[in-house]
Swiss-Prot record:
Gene: SDO1
Assembly, per entry: Associates with the 60S ribosomal subunit.
Function description: Involved in the biogenesis of the 60S ribosomal subunit and translational activation of ribosomes. Together with the EF-2-like GTPase RIA1, may trigger the GTP-dependent release of TIF6 from 60S pre-ribosomes in the cytoplasm, thereby activating ribosomes for translation competence by allowing 80S ribosome assembly and facilitating TIF6 recycling to the nucleus, where it is required for 60S rRNA processing and nuclear export.
Highest classification ranks of the organism: Eukaryota, Fungi, Dikarya, Ascomycota, Saccharomycotina
Further details from the record: Present with 5060 molecules/cell in log phase SD medium.
Keyword Nucleus carried by entry: yes
Protein name (Swiss-Prot/TrEMBL): Ribosome maturation protein SDO1
Family classification: Belongs to the SDO1/SBDS family.
Pfam families with a match to the protein in the record: SBDS_C (PF20268), SBDS_domain_II (PF09377), SBDS_N (PF01172)
Gene Ontology terms for molecular function: 5.8S rRNA binding; guanyl-nucleotide exchange factor activity; large ribosomal subunit rRNA binding; rRNA primary transcript binding; small ribosomal subunit rRNA binding
Record note on what altering C31W does: Impairs protein folding and stability. Loss of function
């Protein structure tokens, strides 16, 4: 819907507003739709490609431009670029209902894709499709929000699904390869690493060989512990972030 500006200014259409309240005053900038998130993520770095008008407003819909006195009082500067930067990074995006729903759908789809990629059925060793993940989360009354990264929400969803088990589900194991130098001097380290990694016969070398290597599966929750153990003493290579069974059965 167009926003009417005072005579002499262009009419703005397809506007996304970013609003920041400071010192009991409201400041707004007018942006192109879908450009704000790109700017915040660093995908778009040119403000001129984001802003419809390179100006700070008190009220965009009424065309009220912020004066220098208010900028100085509230932001400590009259530099419009500095004020715009702060509003862009700290302000709240004012979304229409349609924009909000589109963004929510995008976050939800991204979250479901992550959960599907990281989890498996412990019996079949196969992934669940996003549609089944979505249904399970609906039963658990888990709903995504637009102001939190999809990856973080995916991890929260996984934790809930694994704890409630309304469908049989576990985090898929990671496949890693560890190499430790001078293993004969570090038998305790080798033992600790071996307990974390589930390896098949032949996937680890003898402790007297230098370097000692071990390839196998590890629970993702133990990955940080493994990295800590190997810090400055060896290397950890991730061969597969989520091991699944790709075989088909007739």
């Amino acid at each position: 819907m167009p926003i009417n500006q005072p005579s002499g200014q262009i009419k703005l259409t397809n506007v996304s507003l970013v609003r920041l309240k400071k010192a009991r005053k409201r400041f707004e900038v007018a942006c192109y739709q879908n450009k704000v998130q790109d700017y915040r993520k660093g995908i778009e770095k040119d403000l001129d490609e984001v802003l419809q008008i390179h100006q700070v407003f008190m009220n965009v819909s009424k065309g009220l431009v912020a004066n220098k006195e208010d900028l100085q009082k509230c932001f400590g500067t009259t530099n419009v670029d500095d004020v715009i930067e702060e509003i862009m990074h700290k302000g709240e995006i004012q979304l229409s209902e349609k924009e909000r729903q589109l963004m929510l759908n995008k976050v939800n789809n991204e979250m479901l894709t992550i959960v599907s990629a990281k989890c498996i059925n412990p019996v079949s060793k196969k992934r669940y499709p996003p549609t089944m993940i979505h249904k399970a989360l609906q039963e658990l009354k888990f709903s995504p929000v637009i102001n939190k990264p999809a990856k973080l929400q995916a991890l929260e969803a996984i934790k809930l699904l694994v704890s409630k088990q309304i469908i049989p589900i576990v985090r898929a194991k990671m496949k890693v390869k560890v190499a430790i130098s001078e293993p004969s001097r570090q038998p305790e380290l080798i033992e600790k690493i071996s307990k974390l990694i589930a390896s098949s016969p032949g996937e680890s070398t003898k402790p007297e060989l230098d370097p000692w290597t071990c390839t196998g599966l590890i629970d993702p929750v133990n990955y940080r512990d493994l990295m800590t153990l190997c810090d400055k003493k060896g290397t950890v290579q991730v061969l597969d972030m989520a091991v699944i069974d790709n075989t088909t059965h007739n």
